[in-house]
Structure formats: C-alpha cells, structure tokens
C-alpha cells in the first residue's frame, strides 16, 4: 500500500472538495461517475424466486428514491425470476435498473438463463469467490464474456469477508521479506485493493471497456474503509461504489455509515453509495434509501427533499408542539415531493425551520426560506413566520400547523415555476 496518498487541497470556502474525475458508466437509464450526481442504490432481502415479494420490495425501494436496486441471483430459480420481475415492474411504470448479485456460480447461471443476462442492467462480481485455483481465471473470464456479449457493465466488488485467500497469502509472504514488514491489517487492505483493481485490469484485457467497470472494496470498519478507498482512488480512474459491508442495526449502522462515507464524499471520492443497514424487526427496508439520501443532502452532494431544521428543545420550551409541528412539516414535504419534483422543480432545495423559543428561533427562521418561531416559556402566545429572511406574518390560535403548511405550499407555487403536467 502507498505510504502517502495525494488528495485535493481542501477548499477555503464552506464546500466539499472537487469530485474525483472518473469514467462515466451507463447502467440502464442511470449514469454513474464522470461527474454525474452520486447515485443511491439499495438491495432487496427477499428470496428473488418469490416474484411477487421481490417486485413489491423493488417497487417500495424505488418509490423511496433508490435509483438502482440489487437482487441476489444465487440459483436457477432466482435467475429465471429476473426477467419476470423486470416485466412486472415495467407494467407498473417502474423502469429501475436491476443489478444481479453473483457469487460462486454466476457463470453457470448466466449461461443457463440468457433471458436473465439480458434483463439485468449490471452484474456484480466478487473476485474473492468467482472461482478457486485453476478455475478462477476461467470462470471470471466467462462472466466478463457475458458482460461483453450483452453489453452490460459490471461492478467488481471485493469484500473483506470473502477476500481472495491466494492473493492474501502471496502478499503475506512478500511482506515477510520486507526489511520493515507492514502490519497484518495493512497487508489485507492491500490485498483487497489489488483484488479489485487487478481484476478490473484483467477484464479490460479480455475486452470489457473501462467505461463499463465500477469498483468497490468493502470492509466493516470505518477507518479501514476510509483508508482503502483513499488508496484505491489514487490508483485508478474507475467509478467507485461506496458502502460498509455490514453497517449494523439501528443508530449504530446509521452512524457508522455516515462516519465513513461522509469523509470520503467530502474528499470527492465515491460515485454511488449504498447504506447496508440491518433492519430492525418490523422496520421497512426503505430506511437505507432514506438514510442514503439524507447523507448526500446533508453533505451538500444532492438535494432530494426540503430540509427541515428544528431545535431539540430545552427548559425554555413550553410544550412539545414545536416538535410535533416539525414532524408534520417533514411528513408533508416528503409526501408532496414526488408531485413537486415534476411540477415545481427546485422545491427540493427549499429550507424550512421550526423553532421552539425566542433564543434561536427568529435567527434560524431568517436563515431558512420559510421559518416559524413558536413561543417558549413566558413568551407571548404568538408565532412569527419569516419568509426569505423577512418577517411575513404572525400566527396565533389552534390552526398554526394548518396555516404554516398553507404558507409552505403557497411559497412553492410562487417561487418554483410550475410546469404543465
């Protein structure tokens, strides 16, 4: 692994570093890399052979904002199901690129099910388990031949948990000959990067254009992921897919993903992301999409829905009303965004503030496009509303929530030019 990685000089203003220049990869209707916006993707956890269940979950993920969806293709039944899943989604008006996740037997499944090979928008290949011993190069080559034949891009995704053991052993042997050996973690990171990058170069030798290759090298640790991607980004110009192998459950998974990916994104590294959350019992699979969107929006990479700022509350706030109002506002703009995206483009950039007392309320409200400062303890029972930095109106009574929502809708219609449906 390199002793030093050259990274862009941080900008002097409050912006992220310039995006790393990568090759653009066309995946169905979506373009990854080449300066295009960072793409959100997700993965189903259904049995792919369960066509109805898989269609429903893909549709749910797509409606939540996933721009590509990956499905496990691990046996003949799941491979045969893929074309039917694509057809049913199209009948619903959903044209989302589907990615086939192959391990161990992808070369056999694509050979046996050409309709699957055609229906998928991209193939994911794991160089650590595509084949073993003498079969590795042969089976990897067969997968690349299918990608060439059907004009499909591939993601060559190395994983910490399924690392090419022969490569790892080779690098461990080489490391033992160094005057100052690296620690084991550094050797394994090098093996992970080499597995992905060398496999990509092999695919190019076999005839797959560089513009059809995306790389990933996933681990579960935050610092390890940052180190791996910084190094890998310095070695190639392939588009990169970011994500922890397993982020975890609940807040731990969200925090781990945000800690790792936000650093890389701020440094201009990463062209597509997935937040690999373990859903809690009864929790929707779509949470990983929402978290991915919020991560990209809070780091200034993209805008998906108006941002709502709300204070956390303290002893100065007299009730939970401002918290309830913040929730109502957030739910309202999320529900309206699919319509606004079509009829009022730009509404996703709107900022809103729902504050609970006079200390920061008026100031935060002035910074937002629309903000409301609700009364705190000992304050007059009135709620001034600020629009684009100027006090507009003061709301009172029991209909504050309804009236504030009306002001938001009116602002959208007035500010973001309506397009004919």
Curated annotation (Swiss-Prot):
InterPro entries: Dihydropteroate_synth-like_sf, IspG_bac, IspG_bac-typ, NO2/SO3_Rdtase_4Fe4S_sf. [4Fe-4S] cluster binds at residues 311, 314, 357, 364. One of its GO terms (molecular function) is 4 iron, 4 sulfur cluster binding. GO terms for biological process: isopentenyl diphosphate biosynthetic process, methylerythritol 4-phosphate pathway; terpenoid biosynthetic process. It catalyses: (2E)-4-hydroxy-3-methylbut-2-enyl diphosphate + oxidized [flavodoxin] + H2O + 2 H(+) = 2-C-methyl-D-erythritol 2,4-cyclic diphosphate + reduced [flavodoxin]. Pathway: Isoprenoid biosynthesis; isopentenyl diphosphate biosynthesis via DXP pathway; isopentenyl diphosphate from 1-deoxy-D-xylulose 5-phosphate: step 5/6. Its cofactor is [4Fe-4S] cluster. Binds 1 [4Fe-4S] cluster. It is an enzyme of class 1 (oxidoreductase). Keywords: 4Fe-4S, Iron, Iron-sulfur, Isoprene biosynthesis, Metal-binding, Oxidoreductase. Its EC number is 1.17.7.3. Converts 2C-methyl-D-erythritol 2,4-cyclodiphosphate (ME-2,4cPP) into 1-hydroxy-2-methyl-2-(E)-butenyl 4-diphosphate. Belongs to the IspG family. This is 4-hydroxy-3-methylbut-2-en-1-yl diphosphate synthase (flavodoxin). It comes from Xanthomonas axonopodis pv. citri (strain 306). The gene is ispG.
């Amino acid at each position: 692994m390199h002793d030093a990685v050259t990274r862009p000089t941080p900008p002097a203003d409050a912006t992220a570093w310039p995006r790393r220049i990568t090759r653009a990869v066309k995946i169905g209707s979506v373009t990854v890399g080449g300066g295009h916006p960072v793409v959100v993707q997700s993965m189903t956890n259904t049995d792919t052979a369960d066509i109805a269940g898989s269609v429903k979950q893909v549709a749910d993920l797509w409606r939540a904002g996933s721009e590509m969806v990956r499905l496990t293709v691990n046996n003949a039944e799941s491979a045969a199901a893929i074309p039917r899943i694509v057809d049913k989604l199209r009948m619903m008006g959903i044209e989302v690129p589907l990615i086939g996740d192959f391990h161990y037997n992808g070369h056999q499944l694509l050979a046996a099910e050409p309709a699957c090979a055609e229906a998928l928008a991209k193939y994911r290949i794991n160089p650590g388990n595509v084949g073993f011993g003498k079969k590795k190069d042969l089976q990897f080559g067969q997968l690349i031949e299918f990608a060439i034949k059907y004009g499909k891009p591939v993601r060559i995704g190395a994983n910490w948990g399924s690392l090419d053991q022969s490569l790892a052993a080779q690098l461990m042997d080489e490391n033992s000959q160094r005057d100052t050996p690296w620690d084991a973690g550094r050797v394994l990171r090098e093996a992970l990067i080499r597995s992905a990058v060398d496999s990509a170069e092999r695919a190019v030798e076999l005839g797959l254009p560089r513009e059809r290759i995306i790389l990933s090298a996933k681990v579960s640790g935050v610092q390890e992921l940052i180190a791996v991607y910084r190094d890998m980004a310095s070695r190639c110009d392939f588009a990169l897919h970011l994500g922890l192998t397993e982020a975890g459950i609940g807040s731990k998974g969200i925090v781990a993903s945000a800690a790792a990916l936000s650093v890389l994104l701020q440094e201009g590294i990463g062209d597509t992301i997935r937040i690999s959350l373990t859903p809690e019992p009864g929790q929707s699979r779509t949470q990983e999409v929402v978290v991915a969107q919020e991560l990209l929006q809070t780091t200034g990479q993209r805008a998906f829905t108006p941002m709502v700022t709300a204070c956390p509350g303290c002893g100065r706030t007299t009730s939970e009303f401002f918290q309830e109002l913040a929730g109502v506002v957030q739910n309202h703009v999320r529900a309206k965004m699919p319509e606004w995206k079509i009829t009022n483009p730009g509404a996703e950039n709107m900022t809103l503030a729902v504050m609970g007392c006079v200390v920061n309320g008026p100031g935060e409200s002035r910074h937002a496009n629309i903000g409301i400062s609700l009364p705190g303890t000992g304050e007059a029972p009135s709620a001034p509303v600020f629009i684009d930095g100027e006090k507009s109106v003061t709301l009172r009574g029991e209909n504050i929530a309804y009236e504030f929502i009306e002001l938001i809708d009116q602002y959208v219609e007035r500010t973001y030019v309506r397009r004919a449906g």
